[in-house]
Amino acid sequence: MKLCADILYWRLKEKLTTVTQRGKGGSALTLNRPEFYLDRSQSFEKNRVYVCSADHLPQSPKLGENVCLICLGQHWNLSAYYDRCSVILVEGNWDIFRVFNLVQEIFNRYDSWEDQLWTILRHGGNLPQMLEASRGIFENPMLLIGSDFRYLGVTEEDYLRNKLGLQLDTQSFD
């Protein structure tokens, strides 16, 4: 599954305390799995995530569209990237291999979710099953409403009923 810089940023922020996002963010799901940036390379391919050390970045890079750099540390040249791509800064004393593995885990999590949804769809599952499979991704109560404003499925029904006061037994917003 392809992801976006915003998802990567928020999921990394859950694990690492010193993460900030700069440059072009975005919610379009265009980014492929990460790769390590190899020193001396001047070009960054479009729709790619690169995990790198900020002090190893080139001064005059060729940046494709929708590039996301996950940079460890700061460097004076880094501000030149902010107008041209998404930059997720990881400050502090983090191991580059650990950060790379965390990014891989984020992609694995979303790939697993996509696989679950396809399995449910292929085996004639229903919408409540899809909602249940999505709970770990959205991490909030969900309410699926049809075009006729009837409830098609809910998660955490007790929360919706007791905390938000929704009367789910009427099957609509009447």
Name these PLM-found stretches.
Residues 1-174:
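Alpha-helical/coil-rich non-catalytic "connector" segments in signaling and regulatory proteins
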